[in-house]
Amino acid sequence: MVEENKIVKKVIVTKKPTIKKAPVKAAFKKEVVVKNATVIKKTQTSSKRNTVNITLVKSFHGRLPSHRATIVGLGLKRINHIKELKDTPEIRGMINKVAYLLKVED
């Protein structure tokens, strides 16, 4: 019998070097010191002129997805939910889009 020379292959697995991470810095706290602060109170007349009250009167379920998103964007969550928002052209445009679902009070 002829003995065959068997070649055994050894696979050497090299480990990848670990990535060194920078040490985590401790979060430092900032102290805010207010000296001689004056509080400015807004009058009710100025806040009433610049705001609009909207009430969700009808359900937005079953409506167009863009109309649903507009209602959520206005911050309304359920029927008879009232929200007071600043009276800006952006808000007015959103109100006009879904006016059939809302009651608006200036």
Curated annotation (Swiss-Prot):
CDD domains: Ribosomal_L30 (cd01658). It comes from Ruthia magnifica subsp. Calyptogena magnifica. One of its GO terms (molecular function) is structural constituent of ribosome. GO terms for cellular component: cytosolic large ribosomal subunit. Keywords: Ribonucleoprotein, Ribosomal protein. Belongs to the universal ribosomal protein uL30 family. Disulfide bonds: none annotated. SUPFAM superfamilies: Ribosomal protein L30p/L7e. GO terms for biological process: translation. Part of the 50S ribosomal subunit. The keyword Ribonucleoprotein applies. Pfam families: Ribosomal_L30 (PF00327). It comes from the Bacteria. This is Large ribosomal subunit protein uL30. PANTHER family: LARGE RIBOSOMAL SUBUNIT PROTEIN UL30M, MITOCHONDRIAL RIBOSOMAL PROTEIN L30.
